[in-house]
Amino acid sequence: MAEPLRGRGPRSRGGRGARRARGARGRCPRARQSPARLIPDTVLVDLVSDSDEEVLEVADPVEVPVARLPAPAKPEQDSDSDSEGAAEGPAGAPRTLVRRRRRRLLDPGEAPVVPVYSGKVQSSLNLIPDNSSLLKLCPSEPEDEADLTNSGSSPSEDDALPSGSPWRKKLRKKCEKEEKKMEEFPDQDISPLPQPSSRNKSRKHTEALQKLREVNKRLQDLRSCLSPKQHQSPALQSTDDEVVLVEGPVLPQSSRLFTLKIRCRADLVRLPVRMSEPLQNVVDHMANHLGVSPNRILLLFGESELSPTATPSTLKLGVADIIDCVVLASSSEATETSQELRLRVQGKEKHQMLEISLSPDSPLKVLMSHYEEAMGLSGHKLSFFFDGTKLSGKELPADLGLESGDLIEVWG
């Protein structure tokens, strides 16, 4: 838009020129100046437009009366094209043309690219391009490569790359390597493993639950097979779930065999018996072993007499227990020795206890020899004591006042 043309002439200003004019009033008038002349005055026309054309300046001749020549003032410049126009010089002097400074507006697409980083930083910095097809060629982590491989790129994007682009060369090299791998290993799947997602996690969770249910079902089938009562029909049982147990027959606790130890005189007999078997079988075996009548066999456990009808399970006998077997006198001898004394002889050990019958007129030497023979201690030096008194063997039971049930101690 062009500004209106306006003639400009000399106008009075303050400063040194004005003071000189005021000071000349009191002086003598000067000679009259020459009549008015035609002096061309320069008028600036600023054509403002959006184009990049330069400013047009038009100079038109205007008749201006010649004024008095003031002292030359310092020219002023105004960068803005306001209503006052350009700076004025002294009257009569040729005006200088001042061009307005304008900023050149450029298209954003034509803006020059200025490097942000220095040369060293730029050489070591690889910016990631925005194109998805070029992202595959950038060095990345294995997970990123798997994502890019799964997503893929369309052939139109590969064709859009320039023929001389380094990205296109790298893409071609990568495709050639993949083709070589496929030719060398045609049966091998070289596709990357998919990343675990939320769906895969939920799928794994459901698979784990299914496996647990299958295990519980098989355990229930195993319990039903081991139980005595099977409610399932054989048609419903699967051949894969059958369990065969190869074991011997389960015997009850009462029919279990164990070795019973029987001590008779100087012998120790080991006899296998059952827990539910009565001790009468033991009595018969010992009578046959000693060649005497079963009525003369007496079994003792500690100081208590065992009944032939008792069983090892009722007596709670174990493998470490030992039973003493005593041979009693015959019935004919019993009538003769009805007045005999039954004396107990106890050795140093607890199991070395023996009950011996002795007549009141017999010396104690008979008791000592019978004990040594029964315990297998013949030839050993033994000492017999009664109430703390050492016995020589020549004493009679009546002399010592012995009665049935008295205890005689033996020390070796």
Swiss-Prot record:
Residues 86-96 have a biased composition (Low complexity). Residues 168-227 form a coiled coil. CDD domains: Ubl_SLD1_NFATC2ip, Ubl_SLD2_NFATC2ip. Residues 341-412 form the Ubiquitin-like domain. Highest level detected in spleen, thymus and testis. One of its GO terms (cellular component) is nucleus. Disruption phenotype: Mutant mice are born at the expected Mendelian ratio and appear healthy and viable. No alteration in thymic T-cell populations, T-cell proliferation, or peripheral lymphocyte development. Inefficient type-2 antiparasitic immune response to the intestinal nematode Trichinella spiralis due to impaired IL4 and IL13 cytokine production by Th2 cells. Residues 8-30 have a biased composition (Basic residues). The modification Phosphothreonine is found at T309, T311. Keywords: Coiled coil, Cytoplasm, Isopeptide bond, Methylation, Nucleus, Phosphoprotein, Ubl conjugation. InterPro entries: NFATC2-Int_DNA_Repair (IPR052324), Rad60/SUMO-like_dom (IPR022617), Ubiquitin-like_dom (IPR000626), Ubiquitin-like_domsf (IPR029071). The modification Phosphoserine is found at S49, S51, S79, S81, S83, S118, S191, S197, S307, S362, S383. Pfam families: Rad60-SLD (PF11976). There is a cross-link at K120 (Glycyl lysine isopeptide (Lys-Gly) (interchain with G-Cter in SUMO2)). Residues 175-184 have a biased composition (Basic and acidic residues). Methylation at the N-terminus by PRMT1 modulates interaction with the NFAT complex and results in augmented cytokine production. Signal peptide: none annotated. It is found in: Nucleus; Cytoplasm. The keyword Secreted does not apply. In T-helper 2 (Th2) cells, regulates the magnitude of NFAT-driven transcription of a specific subset of cytokine genes, including IL3, IL4, IL5 and IL13, but not IL2. Recruits PRMT1 to the IL4 promoter; this leads to enhancement of histone H4 'Arg-3'-methylation and facilitates subsequent histone acetylation at the IL4 locus, thus promotes robust cytokine expression. Down-regulates formation of poly-SUMO chains by UBE2I/UBC9. Interacts with NFATC2, TRAF1, TRAF2 and PRMT1. Interacts with UBE2I/UBC9. This is NFATC2-interacting protein. The lineage of its organism: Eukaryota, Metazoa, Chordata, Craniata, Vertebrata.
